């Protein structure tokens, strides 16, 4: 259950409509997912979040779009964000992720989680070669 109520007709606010229109244009889709409807309860939060998402996730960069979605999905799994897991897994699939890639991705996430817990519990000292200053 949400902690806020999504605005009934958010696009009557011109600032919200501008964000939603930009989302539609950027994604080449008429679909506005619930995240944006619920963030519309606060126009400034909506604008800032979309600005950051657009900058990081949609602009050409050194990482390809599928890799970005997989990173986002991995962090979402680590943070137990069910909504984000679903939305970014769907986005990864739309960017070409296969079932085999998804299975491999989940194996890596699982392995990283397990070894992170082991190393946190054991408090293994960090090798000096892994420090940036040693490079």
Residues covered by each model-derived region:
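Hydrophobic alpha-helical segments
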Residues: 1-135
């Amino acid at each position: 259950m949400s902690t806020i109520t999504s605005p009934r007709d958010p696009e009557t606010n011109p600032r919200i409509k501008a964000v939603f229109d930009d989302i539609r244009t950027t994604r080449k889709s008429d679909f506005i997912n619930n995240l944006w409807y619920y963030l519309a309860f606060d126009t400034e939060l909506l604008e800032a979040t979309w600005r950051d998402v657009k900058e990081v996730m949609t602009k050409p960069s050194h990482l390809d779009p599928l890799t970005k979605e997989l990173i986002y999905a991995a962090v979402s799994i680590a943070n137990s964000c069910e909504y984000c897991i679903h939305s970014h897994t769907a986005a990864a699939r739309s960017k070409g992720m296969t079932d085999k890639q998804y299975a491999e991705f989940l194996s890596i996430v699982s392995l990283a989680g397990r070894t992170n817990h082991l190393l946190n519990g054991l408090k293994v000292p960090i090798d000096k070669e892994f420090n940036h200053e040693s490079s």
